[in-house]
Amino acid sequence: VGTAPTKEVRFIDSLNRRAYAYRYKNLDSSYLPAEQAYGQARLYQQGKAEACNNLGFCAFMQMDFERAEKIYKEVYGLTKNELELLIADIGLMKIYQRTGMNKEYYDYRNSAVRRMKRIREDSTVFTDKYEMLRVNFAFTEFFIVSSVYYYYLQQRPEAMASLDKIPLDA
């Protein structure tokens, strides 16, 4: 496996950053650069994995859960990057929560918990401001998704405890 050229890495990263920046502002403006990053990533598999996470988010927001699931699952074959894998885990948690697939929800939740522990143990790896933003967002989203799940199960104390774990400085 070769190393991606710097030009490709910078281009794909810029597309992914644009997709991420628009995710809650304009879904179309998020989708288009994510699709472009996915299609143009040749050797930069981590960038393609990030594009998958952005595309999975868009599909989820459009309530196309089958497509979102397929896209998120593709991440596992593209990278070993714990952040991208964590984001895919959380995306799948959200899908399985919405579709009532409790076993699958817990499988990916347990995977996310293990990844979060590894990320915390090796937090010096994430020095880039954008990466830190994504780490903080992923952790926050994990606790929100967990809280909603507990709330649906009428486990209010657990739901509140999960919300209390959201880092305030994130």
Regions found by a protein language model. Give the residues of each.
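A "functional boundary" signal
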Residues: 1-170
